[in-house]
């Protein structure tokens, strides 16, 4: 008789650790997004103290559900000094649970990764907000992130015959017509934001956009850009005439500082969605 030691180990492991609902939420999120940073993990596990959080993380690591690594991010904002972030990906048991292959690398360096981690953090807050005390999910708050918005990949705004403009929102709550954009660096090309106002009004009819920015200065700058574009016209098709950006477009695009959002996220989400 042949003894399968791997099955014995798996069996013992399952007896010694029982996955809680928040564990499953965390693992599902990692499975969907490939990796996760420690702040987002804490939001999903809903642990009030660092000790409780890390005790649970160590438990999940010890039974091969997740792996811990350190990501180096080089950012001009930090004078090119490397910043290390704690990140997690699925390990052996986690991959088995969701039928995923073991992830060998975690993310990429630079601003792109920094932006993605912020998107995951905000998405994690939306995920917690949509679940009630009984673990039921509010379907109105089903959301999609840029990585899965395949039907947006070919969206174009035609400014003129030579220029094409493609947009994929960071987070889309489709049932509520709500877009959430994380904008860590306000671009010097102001036309970028004029195109966004135009796109949300005419091409997809999503005129409810929340812009999460990194500072109060960026907030003031972006609001001013939006106000200056009120009444501007854009041509998005070679056949159709130019159309105007509504004069109240700036009022329909909310700008919020990220730190303010993270301090009381439930308050902001209740305000934006009309849900408690």
Question: Model-derived features: where do they sit?
Answer:
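Short glycine/proline-enriched coil/turn segments at helix->beta-strand junctions
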Residues: 47, 174-178, 204-207
């Amino acid at each position: 008789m042949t003894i399968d030691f791997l099955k014995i180990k798996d069996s013992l492991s399952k007896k010694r650790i029982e996955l809680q609902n928040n564990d499953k939420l965390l693992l599902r999120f990692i499975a969907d997004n490939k990796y996760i940073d420690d702040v987002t993990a804490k939001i999903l596990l809903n642990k009030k103290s660092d000790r409780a959080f890390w005790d649970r993380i160590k438990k999940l690591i010890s039974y091969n559900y997740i792996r811990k690594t350190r990501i180096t991010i080089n950012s001009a904002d930090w004078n090119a000094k490397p910043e290390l972030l704690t990140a997690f990906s699925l390990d052996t048991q986690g991959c088995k649970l969701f039928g995923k292959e073991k992830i060998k690398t975690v993310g990429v360096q630079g601003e792109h990764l920094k932006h993605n981690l912020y998107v995951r953090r905000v998405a994690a807050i939306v995920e917690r907000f949509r679940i009630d005390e009984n673990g039921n999910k509010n379907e109105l708050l089903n959301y999609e992130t840029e990585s899965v918005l395949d039907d947006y990949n070919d969206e174009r705004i035609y400014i003129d015959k030579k220029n094409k403009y493609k947009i994929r929102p960071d987070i889309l709550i489709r049932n509520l017509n709500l877009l959430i954009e994380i904008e860590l660096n306000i671009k010097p090309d102001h036309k970028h934001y004029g195109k966004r106002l135009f796109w949300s009004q005419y091409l997809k009819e999503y005129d409810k956009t929340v812009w999460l920015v990194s500072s109060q200065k960026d907030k003031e700058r972006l609001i001013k850009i939006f106000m200056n574009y009120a009444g501007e016209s854009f041509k998005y098709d070679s056949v159709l005439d130019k159309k105007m950006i509504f004069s109240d477009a700036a009022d329909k695009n909310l700008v919020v500082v990220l730190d303010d959002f993270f301090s009381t996220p439930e308050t902001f989400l209740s305000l934006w969605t009309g849900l408690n």
